[in-house]
Amino acid sequence: MSAGKGLLLVICLLFLPLKSAMALNCYFGTSGGAVEKSEAIQPFAVPGNAKPGDKIWESDDIKIPVYCDNNTNGNFESEHVYAWVNPYPGVQDRYYQLGVTYNGVDYDASLGKSRIDTNQCIDSKNIDIYTPEQIIAMGWQNKICSGDPANIHMSRTFLARMRLYVKIREMPPHDYQSTLSDYIVVQFDGAGSVNEDPTAQNLKYHITGLENIRVLDCSVNFSISPETQVIDFGKFNLLDIRRHTMSKTFSIKTTKSQNDQCTDGFKVSSSFYTEETLVEEDKALLIGNGLKLRLLDENASPYTFNKYAEYADFTSDMLVYEKTYTAELSSIPGTPIEAGPFDTVVLFKINYN
């Protein structure tokens, strides 16, 4: 009898994690949508001066519409949706470290399997058998996402914003080609664990094309004018900024390394990156005080923030490239302007191609 009880106990333990892992379904965009999505990495390059820990490639902002439902928790508890980063950490590359920037924080395989709370809460489908009055009578309001039995959420649709990146573990040889062509960087799942069942309805996001990374024997250096790297609009009154925009110029000078070891040709793409709220198809940054900022090229066309575009071509004999930009400050129609000092941070980022 004791052996039979022992066997029964082992079976229960084996099935408990499976129940937890299968608590949620998540799809791309809508119920029953795709559960496999991919981002193809365009061929890019590792600069010759890269050091371990350097981020050598980064994607544009990726905005993933996620739909989740099917909380089957038998204890009637609600459950949060988690973005599991690096869900299958056993698959790695010797030289390249993959990762995700989620809500401004970097998560990579050096951290192991990481779970990120999306703050999207889904109520148990089992609680639907009770009326709001019965839920209140049992004191189960704390089991519900909203705390209100009349406001139950059996599903959630939200937008997950992230960036994919590649870091250097150690500098690869000049002719190295990665064998890691397809890698799952994030899976949307429940709190318990990653559901590894290949038939599971849990949205996975892959990156592909890692075999197209090449290693350069060259790099570039940057200098920004003004040297303080601060665009100062000075003092102005509210009436002035209501009437017209204010502009300041700055420039970025890029110099290709000039030595006997530098033999490769390459291109550089760039992005103006911000964590602030964007409007106008991501071409204007809200400063938070009733003003907005745009960055314009030499033809007065606005740049799209958080998106890479070709910046300089060093495949020819060109060694130095300089470009001038305009920072344009303006008011937001119909929005009060707060007087006082303000600042915002915009990063200039590059990828080698």
Curated annotation (Swiss-Prot):
<comment type="similarity">
    <text>To E.coli YqiI.</text>
</comment>
<keyword id="KW-0732">Signal</keyword>
<dbReference type="GO" id="GO:0007155">
    <property type="term" value="P:cell adhesion"/>
</dbReference>
<dbReference type="InterPro" id="IPR008966">
    <property type="entry name" value="Adhesion_dom_sf"/>
</dbReference>
<protein>
    <recommendedName>
        <fullName>Uncharacterized protein YbgO</fullName>
    </recommendedName>
</protein>
<dbReference type="GO" id="GO:0009289">
    <property type="term" value="C:pilus"/>
</dbReference>
<comment type="function">
    <text>May be involved in a fimbrial system chaperoned by YbgP and exported by YbgQ.</text>
</comment>
<feature type="signal peptide">
    <location>
        <begin position="1"/>
        <end position="23"/>
    </location>
</feature>
<dbReference type="InterPro" id="IPR036937">
    <property type="entry name" value="Adhesion_dom_fimbrial_sf"/>
</dbReference>
